[in-house]
Amino acid sequence: MKRATTLAVAGTLLLAALATPLPALAADPAPTLKPMLGVYLGRATVKDLDTQATEERDIDVEVTPFDRDGFRIRWVNVTLVDGRRNLPGVKRRVSELTFKPAKGRNFFVEVPQANVFAEREEVQPLGGDPVRWAVQDAAGLHVHSFVILGDGRYELQTYSRKRTDSGIVLHYERVVDGKLVRTIDGQAVKVE
């Protein structure tokens, strides 16, 4: 009789476990990230503060969930020639970064790109590898990249994206050894 009771209890627990809703296996980012998720298309102006040269870029930004509470950001920059993208000299650059929450902290850290054919290597900041992190706050989503340059100077890049009613406003700054050398400002609409 004890064996039958044990089996009955085990069966009941198994059924209860199967009937209990499980957390979604698909990505479910932190609630504060949800307004930022989406695909955005727009244009930005790049300004070199040393030369005062400017250039126009078409921008394509995609923010998607990663794992349970992280995010992936992918962006495409198309540097235009005379405001057009169908002329010789146009440049296209694609970048992608993935972030997950830092344990016990209120920011995100970069997740290294997976490569099944290579051994995982640790980030080497003194070897020139960038250290990247992201912060979500009331002003938007900010991605920071810090690099120690070969000559001992440093570079800090900050790319901020702020949600608007129709999309996002973008602002980028590149600082080398304390001096602001480049900015990018633009707007992008959310694609339905």
Give each language-model segment a name.
Residues 32-36, 53-55, 67, 137, ...:
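Solvent-exposed loop and beta-edge segments used for protein-protein assembly and interaction
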Residues 41-45, 76, 144-146, 162, ...:
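Residue-level recognition of well-ordered beta-strand positions that form the cores
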Residues 154-192:
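Edge beta-strand at a domain terminus
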Residues 38-44, 57-59, 168-170, 184:
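One face of beta-strands
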